[in-house]
Amino acid sequence: MSRDALGFGVVRTHRSVFSLVRDMTAATQIVKAAAGLHISVRNFDRAERFLAQAVSEPPFLVILDLEKCEVEAFRVLNELHKNADLKNVPAVGFVTQAKGMVKPEAEKAGCFRVYMKTEFGRELPDLISRYAV
């Protein structure tokens, strides 16, 4: 338990953030932001591992690297929506401006929100605490 970044009070969750991220800078940002809230992060580099773990230990938030894991991220979105226990888990993603055309496709596939990479880094602590509450 810890105080959340938005001042909502104590964050009470024993579930983790699951991320499918290959960008090491972004993965580090996610871990640091979650650690500040005393929330654990499970980072995966393959959709198969991600999905196997999500079925046994549902996360409270999914973060997807839509730039470096585009195909696998769409596979994760598809599988999340097929599974009754996981279909309500919020998924967010991030892309660079160069791959911005992926944003509407990801939102149509079930991503709650797709951030530009620079915005994602700025919003990360608030984003995690918002979904943890």
Question: Can you say where each PLM-predicted feature lies in the sequence?
Answer:
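Non-catalytic signal-transmission and effector/linker regions of two-component phosphorelay proteins
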Residues: 1-16, 31, 127-133
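Two-component/phosphorelay signaling modules centered on CheY-like receiver
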Residues: 24-42
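A short, hydrophobic beta-strand element within the central beta-sheet of small alpha/beta folds
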Residues: 88-98
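Conserved phosphotransfer cores of two-component systems
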Residues: 81-87, 109
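Acidic, metal-coordinating helix/loop segments flanking the phosphotransfer/catalytic sites
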Residues: 46-61, 71
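Conserved acidic segment of CheY-like receiver
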Residues: 14-24
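Conserved phosphotransfer microenvironments
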Residues: 64-80
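Alpha4 helix (beta4-alpha4-beta5 surface) of REC/receiver domains from two-component response regulators
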Residues: 98-113
